[in-house]
């Protein structure tokens, strides 16, 4: 009998639970944007861009990559930093669009969505602040 020399590394969601929560939030936002093709209606010149499924797809891909990074045992600091900065940019764009729509349409749910995006953005900033910046 040959002895199996493979080492199986244990994957734990307890290592980076905030990253998993952020990744799930991004996947949720992406699904909402993909499922609703007429979510954004203002400004008129940007509606095709904002309602494109590519925007929702980017949210989903970044969310999945953040979850994958958090479950991986070879966590690279540069990858984490880049994913979190891209997330901040996406959330800032989304929150700005939500507030603009709320102002133009007067619909309170757009303001609510904008505030929720800001809260997730602040959560992202807190993760960035707590994350390692370099190898020590």
What do the predicted segments below correspond to?
Residues 16-23, 76-87:
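Membrane-interfacial loop-to-transmembrane alpha-helix junctions, especially the N-terminal start
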Residues 8-13, 72-80:
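Membrane-interface helix-boundary motifs at transmembrane edges
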Residues 18-19, 43-61:
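A loop-to-helix transmembrane entry motif
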Residues 118-136:
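Membrane-water interface at the C-terminal end of transmembrane alpha helices
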Residues 1-26:
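Cytosolic juxtamembrane helix and N-cap/initiation of the first transmembrane helix
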Residues 74, 78, 85, 91-113, ...:
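Membrane-helix boundary connector in multi-pass membrane proteins
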Residues 34-42, 71, 96-104:
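Juxtamembrane "helix-exit" motif on the non-cytosolic side of transmembrane helices
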Residues 59-73:
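Canonical alpha-helical transmembrane segments
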